[in-house]
Design a protein with these regions (language model features):
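Residues immediately within or flanking Cys/His clusters that coordinate Zn2+
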Residues: 3, 10, 28, 395
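Short, cysteine/histidine-rich loop/knuckle motifs that typically chelate Zn2+
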Residues: 7-8, 32-33, 397
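Short, non-ligating residues that shape and space the ligands of small metal-coordination modules
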Residues: 12-16, 39-43
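Short linker/helix segments within small regulatory modules
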Residues: 18-28
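Conserved, well-structured core domains of diverse proteins
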Residues: 47-146, 150, 155-166, 174, ...
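Active-site-facing alpha/beta catalytic cores
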Residues: 143, 150, 155-273, 277-300
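Glycine-rich phosphate/ribose-binding loops and adjacent secondary-structure elements
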Residues: 258-410
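Gly/Ser/Thr/Ala-enriched C-terminal appendages of enzymes
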Residues: 359-364, 368-469
Length: 469
């Protein structure tokens, strides 16, 4: 009796527990979770290596030496990837963040107030209201410092975008459009909406710019910095094609940079133009954490109202695995460096937003204490909506209907139920942020500071202002 595993959703077909052997299953049989065919299954790692030939892709060379194939090696950890490259001749594409461990927020601890500073009682009110772009004519005001990051309609289903918009609205926080343009129903359902301005300039009209609450110019993201976006043809529905001005069923490629932004003067002209066209809404910029100080100096020259730094390990809908694994400054260090350069430049009216791998209220509290004004969350918001981390976003076969355009899979997602889950998540973490403020003796979550933190990691204490325990 053997076990066969779906390479997309990791479902296991165990012959021991089934009434039909794998070989006896009809050719049209599909995975009960994600709907993939038999060709997407391979022998599970728990089987003996010589159990059978394993087929993934016709003509891929998968059958060659299959009798002796081993799924992995404890010492040569890249063996499976090398075999895959050798068989396909193509780079491995993966969603979500890198699996390689990075510096953890768990290495940072919050110091509770005792005598030197008194904690606050549960009954004492705590301010969570958050101001982004205070120097703008119309600053963005949220009731919590945590909001939904940029994830496009295309990477996500219509239902997922609506659930995130409705859920964030119930919590009186913002949702971002993502790089795929504006889904009108998502904008209408939102409480506050941040539009992502990208090289392909989807949805960039004077009417739309007047409707949104802020605009963020996307320069890069940590999981694939310096690379453009790619939406596979299988995800390009007629509706997505209409929003993006493309053809249905064809791959959509986003450029790696803006063709009309080649200098800091060009960036300044773009910021000025967007500020005028929005009527004075906050204009920001999103940067992958790399040349942090130099990039921030250019952003400040351009006159932005807020800067988003995306650190390692930020997520993505799809990225070359090798790029995701090898790039970007870890979020903790990126935040410390960004705060330092902004302070040294006297940029106290420029809001700092951090994103990339933050999940829980304790992560958020630590980021606020390190100098972030707000936190954008993508994966955490998706999980709140119902994501089960199958990590197959790039295939379009998400079993829970979030990262797919398949009508049958999308039908599994109940917009209102997922919206309530998202709202509950934001409300819960906001209340937990109040608790962290109280236990550190602060009546405002934005008053959390470095004095409230310490670290058990000497690398962090050596390269950030955080003191070691």
């Amino acid at each position: 009796m053997a076990k066969w595993q779906c390479e997309l959703c990791l479902y296991i077909y165990d012959e021991l527990n089934e009434s039909v052997t794998w070989e006896a299953l009809p050719k049209e049989w599909t995975c009960p979770v994600c709907g993939s065919g038999k060709e997407s299954f391979s022998l599970a790692a728990s089987n003996p290596p010589a159990a059978a030939s394993i087929g993934v892709e016709t003509g891929s060379g998968e059958e060659y030496l299959a009798e002796w194939r081993r799924p992995a090696d404890d010492f040569e950890v890249n063996m499976a990837d090398i075999h895959r490259l050798a068989m396909t001749g193509k780079s491995i594409i993966e969603p979500m963040r890198t699996r390689i461990p990075t510096f953890s927020w768990d290495d940072i601890l919050i110091k509770g107030a005792q005598l030197a500073k008194m904690p606050l009682n549960k009954t004492e009110p705590i301010v969570t209201q958050t101001l982004i772009g205070p120097a703008a004519a119309f600053p963005l005001i949220l009731e919590t410092p945590v909001f939904v990051s940029h994830i496009s309609f295309g990477a996500l289903s219509r239902e997922a975008k609506l659930a995130l918009a409705k859920g964030s609205a119930l919590a009186k926080t913002a949702i971002c459009s993502g790089e795929g343009g504006i889904l009108p129903e998502s904008l209408a359902a939102s409480w506050r909406y941040i539009f992502e301005y990208v090289p392909n300039k989807y949805s960039v009209t004077d009417e739309n710019l007047k409707l949104v609450d802020a605009v963020e110019i996307k320069i890069g993201q940590s999981a694939k910095p310096g690379m453009g976006g790619h939406l596979p043809a299988s995800k390009v529905t007629s509706e997505i094609a209409a929003i993006r001005g493309c053809r249905e069923g064809e791959d959509i490629i986003s450029p790696a940079h803006f063709p009309d932004i080649r200098s800091k003067e060009d960036l300044k002209a773009t910021v000025t133009d967007l500020r005028l066209r929005t009527g004075g809404k906050p204009i920001g910029i999103k940067l992958a954490a790399g040349h942090i100080e130099e990039d921030i100096d250019i952003a400040l020259y351009a006159g932005v109202d807020f800067i988003t730094i995306d650190g390692r390990a930020g997520g993505t809908g799809a990225s070359p695995k090798v790029v995701k694994n090898a790039t970007s400054v870890p979020t903790i260090f990126a935040l410390a460096r960004a705060r330092k350069i902004l302070d040294s430049r006297g940029a106290d009216t420029v809001s700092l937003i951090i994103t990339g791998g933050l999940r829980t209220s304790s992560d958020f509290a630590k980021a606020l204490a390190m100098g972030a004004d707000a936190i954008a969350v993508g994966t955490a918001a998706m999980i709140a909506a119902g994501c089960q981390q199958y990590r197959i976003c790039n295939t379009g076969k998400c079993p829970v209907g979030i990262a797919t355009q398949d009508p049958a899979l999308r039908a599994r997602l109940d917009v209102d139920k997922s919206a309530l889950r998202v709202a509950n998540f934001f409300k819960a973490v906001t209340e937990e942020l109040r608790d962290f403020a109280r236990l550190t003796g602060n009546d405002n979550v934005h008053h959390l500071s470095l004095a409230d933190l310490c670290t058990t990691n000497s690398e962090i204490s050596s390269h950030t202002p955080l003191e070691h325990v």
